[in-house]
Amino acid sequence: MTQLNIAPASTDTAAASNNNAAAGTKQLARWRVADIVSLYELPFNDLMFQAQQTHREHFDANTVQLSTLLSIKTGGCEEDCAYCPQSVHHDTGLQADKLMPVDEVLAAAKVAKENGATRFCMGAAWRNPKDRHLEPIKDMIRGVKAMGLETCVTLGMLETHQAQGLREAGLDYYNHNLDTSPEFYGQIISTRTYQDRLDTLERVRDAGINVCCGGIVGLGESRRERAGLIAQLANMDPYPESVPINNLVQVEGTPLTGTEAIDPFEFVRTIAIARITMPRAMVRLSAGREQMNEALQAMCFLAGANSIFYGDQLLTTSNPQAEADRKLLERLGIRAEAAQQMPLDQSGCEHGCDKHAAPN
């Protein structure tokens, strides 16, 4: 089984490069937490300039992908994630529902496509799905793909055979977020370990499914802990093809109600650093967009975000209305279509910046 390599925060990049050269192997430079903290500490304009340069090297800077996320099974989750209104551990007034019928999901996908989405994501609030749950979900995947939409599901932890079954159904992406850094993780979740998450990501990768993996900021973590999350993501080998960055949406009844909100510029910095450290990933502006004004959203696009979740609801929290999204993108001159990745420049640094030398 191919192991997802997570580099320790204290990795000495220069020494690692020398060892690799001596062994005749090629390996990308690894991001230390200290490197990422240094990016956070750059003057804001310098960071934005570097992020935009990186973005333009790898993508059309005036294109974003519209994604729609549908909750196909809401509430009743046995996990205790402190941010989540779907947990049975929190009294949020959310009513648990059973898995949606396949025809209703496909009808929602049809509407999403008519509204301009090119990616359809389906989320179910489970710790881990039973095998019997996956049969109708495979039908959903096949039906959505038949419409020409990119497919993504998030169902919790997976076993090896389950990941393989989803791949055989044609699944494009599996979402399983790390949520936060290893150091802060215990403050947020106790029912699932960090290694549990990494194990599921490994099974997804081994099955040949693209990885969608990001996190949430504004949970009460420090800047260094935010940097720790980015380091974990960027040092995956390979890093995720899709990186959703969520801004905490506080829901009454969850333990994080009343948490001090993250500074808006710090959120933009996080988007920019995700772009710099994972230059060829789709960086998705995800939950929390409703609490951002239009200028802040535009700044996130400038920082390198090239996908938004589009529609009136994002799982169990609200999202800017579709018409407002269309008008904003039009005013910014941004086209809503599948983002086009630029050809890889084999001679340059894969990280897309002058901070790292290209591997020898």
Curated annotation (Swiss-Prot):
Domain called Radical SAM core: residue spans: 62-289
Binding site for [4Fe-4S] cluster: C77, C81, C84
Annotated [2Fe-2S] cluster binding sites: C121, C152, C212, R284
UniProt keyword annotations, A-Z: 2Fe-2S, 4Fe-4S, Biotin biosynthesis, Iron, Iron-sulfur, Metal-binding, S-adenosyl-L-methionine, Transferase
Catalytic activity as recorded in UniProt: (4R,5S)-dethiobiotin + (sulfur carrier)-SH + 2 reduced [2Fe-2S]-[ferredoxin] + 2 S-adenosyl-L-methionine = (sulfur carrier)-H + biotin + 2 5'-deoxyadenosine + 2 L-methionine + 2 oxidized [2Fe-2S]-[ferredoxin]
Metabolic or biological pathway: Cofactor biosynthesis; biotin biosynthesis; biotin from 7,8-diaminononanoate: step 2/2
Taxonomy, superkingdom: Bacteria
InterPro entries reported for this sequence: Aldolase_TIM, BATS_dom, Biotin_synth/BioAB, Biotin_synthase, Elp3/MiaA/NifB-like_rSAM, rSAM
SMART domains, alphabetized: BATS (SM00876), Elp3 (SM00729)
Cofactor note as given: Binds 1 [4Fe-4S] cluster. The cluster is coordinated with 3 cysteines and an exchangeable S-adenosyl-L-methionine.
Region ranges (Disordered): 1-21
One record GO biological process: biotin biosynthetic process
Oligomer status and interactors: Homodimer.
The family this protein is said to belong to: Belongs to the radical SAM superfamily. Biotin synthase family.
Role this protein plays: Catalyzes the conversion of dethiobiotin (DTB) to biotin by the insertion of a sulfur atom into dethiobiotin via a radical-based mechanism.
Protein name: Biotin synthase
Species for this entry: Paraburkholderia xenovorans (strain LB400)
